[in-house]
């Protein structure tokens, strides 16, 4: 469509290059929700009872979830329980996985009652505050999400969806990774242990 458009608005400089440049291409950045703009990290962490030493991971794959990645996340959450991690982790399953993901995690050894710092929910209704308070966000790499991550200045582990036109999520993620804002993990390389190890490594790097 870009070749026939009078104006093309893009979120990333790399998109300008991919579209061949020219006067009709305008770098605007991604629109960001008002609640993201208003989010305050200090107030958000106070809201969730987090001290300066506490760490929180927020993970989600979109409102409907992603079955393949939710299966891996079930195993990752089980590893967190078995290893007794001290950080807080809130994972949004999406509607489709709300019933089976906790059950799958428990089958792999997760005990959520014994580890209240690990929370599984269908949907995160206060996402702006959760993201602002987080020390690490694990998610897909849609343009809107990346715009919010950049606005909040939160580090991320991005797993781009491979089921999108022209693999644009990986291109989005690589642009942010090049600037040091995230770590990219391809879906084909993901499994519960890899997810767990990546989360531990990123949380241990407090300067990132």
Q: What positions do the PLM features span?
A:
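Nucleotide-activated sugar donor-binding and catalytic core shared by glycosyltransferases
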Residues: 1-208
């Amino acid at each position: 469509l870009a070749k026939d458009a009078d104006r093309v608005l893009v979120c990333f400089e790399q998109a300008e290059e991919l579209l061949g440049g020219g006067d009709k291409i305008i770098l605007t950045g991604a629109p960001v929700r008002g609640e993201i703009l208003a989010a305050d990290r200090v107030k958000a962490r106070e809201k969730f009872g987090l001290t300066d030493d506490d760490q929180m991971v927020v993970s989600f794959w979109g409102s409907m979830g992603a079955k393949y990645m939710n299966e891996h996340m079930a195993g990752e959450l089980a590893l967190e329980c078995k290893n007794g991690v001290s950080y807080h982790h809130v994972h949004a399953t999406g509607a489709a996985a709300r019933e089976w993901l906790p059950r799958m995690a428990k089958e792999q050894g997760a005990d959520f009652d014994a580890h209240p710092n690990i929370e599984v929910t269908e949907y995160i209704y206060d996402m702006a505050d959760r993201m602002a308070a987080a020390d690490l966000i694990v998610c897909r790499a849609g343009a809107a999400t990346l715009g919010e991550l950049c606005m909040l200045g939160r580090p991320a582990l991005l797993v781009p969806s491979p089921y999108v036109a022209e693999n644009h999520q990986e291109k989005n993620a690589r642009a942010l990774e090049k600037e040091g804002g995230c770590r990219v993990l391809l879906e084909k390389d993901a499994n519960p242990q890899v997810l767990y190890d990546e989360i531990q490594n990123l949380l241990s790097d407090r300067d990132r």
